[in-house]
């Protein structure tokens, strides 16, 4: 889900007929999971035999029967269709919103001053940073668990997660308002007057709500709901900017109004999630508290891991807002938006991988063999095109963006290949139930990336920030690559059923 300003990243899958996802249970607070191994929660614990083992002479051992080749081919085809159905909806949503978002930014950069675009980008970066902190892992928890819950519990689980995350972001945004006079010139806009302050708070909370909605749609395999919400938001934003131009309100607060208002209106798509009404008594406060306790630990594990990998984007945007003047920030924000739009398809491959693997290690191996080469190939092609065509792309936004943004765009796209490796590493560790280990590794990597971007920005400005980030991310990817290649090359052993029965004799 992209940002609300110019700086913006049980059943069958909708449209497919693959086998249903295995149901997954989520542990309570007392559950324990051995690092490095799949627990019964994540992968399903092997059930014991239904009857007592027979005495050896009474049970002739038959050779293991190999599954029929046609059945195996049909199962593999269903896996592939399900994976790329989820991926297809993600691409459609991002493609539609990207085209409309770029159109919006092209209009804004031509009709609004670079300073106003930069100030709106600073507010946007701050809002998305608050959303990253206030999410508490709830959006990713909904991706992983919502589809496997009983139908009657889905609405109350979704709404409880929405309330908690939005309330957290509301508190954080109010705190940011109080501190904004001390956060640099680009961020002082959010407390310039009461109207702008209200728009900032509403936009921050609505950004969190939209992120929660989109992830719930992925978890429920309601890709069309995510597609419609994102498209409606982007189309309305473009229309509101047109109205602002007609009435002469070409200011940074006007851009904030367009983004906040359209995010709120896009929630009319909530019925498209097709959530059943909550049974009487299931939506009361005590039941919601019980849900929060049940899923709290797992959600926070997702949150720590998500912060350790995705917080880099928000922190880099915040670093730019603190170190770069508003005009330069507009050029950086535009280059970053173009880069994130171009690189979203490789990222969505990894997200589809996480949504479909369901803790099945053999399925994980097969899907990684599909998504990793495709992601790297797409990313490599995008880098080549961007290095050559960067000035032509930025010309859409005006001559100033070509002059001052081309180098930034060429450096930023070099981050893309590293993130294909990072995103696959995270999806693999989640499937293996090794959230704690992955969080530590990714936290260290995030510190390296942030340090590279900050040092580059301090000493060499916008160009140094982009170059420092690209170098640090590439070094991190080199460290993570062996773990990804192990899953890519090695299929986990599967113990034949007949061997299991013989061992019980």
Predicted regions: what is each one?
Residues 134-151, 278, 339-363, 430-431:
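Helix-loop junctions and terminal segments of transmembrane helices
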Residues 85-98, 123, 128, 132-181, ...:
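Membrane-water interface segments that mark the loop-to-transmembrane alpha-helix transition
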Residues 194-201, 227-278, 446-448, 462-487:
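Hydrophobic alpha-helical transmembrane segments
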Residues 85-105, 226, 230-233, 237, ...:
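Transmembrane helical elements of multi-pass membrane transporters/channels
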Residues 53-61, 65, 79-139, 300-326, ...:
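Signature of the first transmembrane helix
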Residues 76, 180-200, 326, 388-420:
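Interfacial segments at transmembrane-helix termini and the short loops linking adjacent helices
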């Amino acid at each position: 889900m992209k940002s609300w300003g110019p700086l913006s990243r049980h059943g069958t899958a909708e449209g497919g007929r693959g086998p249903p996802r295995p149901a997954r249970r989520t542990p309570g607070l007392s559950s324990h999971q051995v690092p490095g191994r799949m627990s019964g929660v994540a992968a399903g614990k092997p059930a014991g035999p239904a009857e007592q083992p027979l005495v050896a002479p009474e049970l002739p051992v038959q050779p293991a029967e190999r599954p029929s080749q046609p059945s195996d081919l049909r199962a593999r085809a269903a896996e592939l269709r399900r994976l790329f159905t989820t991926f297809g909806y993600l691409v459609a949503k991002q493609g539609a919103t990207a085209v409309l978002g770029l159109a919006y930014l092209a209009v804004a950069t031509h009709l609004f001053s670079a300073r106003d675009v930069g100030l709106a980008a600073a507010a946007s970066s701050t809002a998305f940073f608050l959303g990253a902190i206030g999410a508490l892992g709830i959006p990713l928890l909904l991706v992983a668990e919502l589809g496997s819950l009983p139908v009657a519990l889905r609405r109350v689980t979704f709404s409880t997660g929405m309330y908690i995350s939005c309330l957290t972001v509301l508190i954080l945004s109010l705190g940011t308002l109080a501190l904004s006079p001390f956060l640099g010139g680009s961020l002082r806009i959010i407390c310039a007057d009461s109207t702008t302050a209200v728009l900032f708070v509403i936009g921050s909370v609505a950004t969190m709500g939209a992120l929660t909605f989109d992830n719930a749609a992925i978890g429920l395999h309601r890709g069309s709901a995510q597609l419609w919400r994102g498209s409606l938001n982007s189309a309305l934003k473009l229309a509101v900017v047109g109205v602002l131009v007609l009435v002469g309100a070409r200011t940074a607060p006007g851009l904030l109004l367009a983004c906040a208002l359209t995010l709120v209106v896009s929630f009319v798509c909530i019925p498209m999630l097709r959530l059943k009404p909550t049974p009487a008594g299931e939506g009361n406060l005590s039941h919601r508290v019980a849900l929060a306790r049940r899923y709290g630990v797992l959600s926070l594990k997702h949150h720590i891991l998500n912060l350790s990998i995705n917080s880099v984007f928000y922190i880099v945007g915040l670093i730019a807002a603190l170190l770069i003047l508003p005009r330069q920030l507009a050029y950086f924000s535009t280059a970053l938006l173009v880069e994130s739009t171009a690189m979203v398809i490789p990222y969505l491959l990894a997200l589809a991988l996480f949504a479909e693997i369901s803790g099945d290690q053999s399925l994980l191996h097969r899907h990684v063999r599909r998504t990793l080469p495709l992601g790297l190939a797409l990313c490599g092609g995008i880098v080549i095109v961007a290095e050559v065509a960067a000035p032509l792309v930025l010309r859409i936004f005006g001559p100033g963006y070509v002059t001052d943004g081309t180098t930034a765009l060429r450096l930023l796209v070099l981050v893309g290949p590293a993130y294909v490796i990072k995103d696959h590493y995270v999806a693999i560790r989640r499937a293996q139930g090794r959230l704690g280990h992955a969080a530590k590794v990714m936290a260290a990597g995030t510190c390296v990336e942030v340090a590279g971007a900050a040092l580059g920005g301090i000493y060499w400005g916008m160009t140094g920030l982009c170059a420092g980030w690209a170098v640090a991310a590439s070094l991190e990817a080199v460290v993570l690559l062996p773990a990804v290649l192990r899953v890519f090359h090695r299929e986990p052993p599967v113990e034949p059923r007949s061997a299991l029965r013989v061992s019980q004799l």
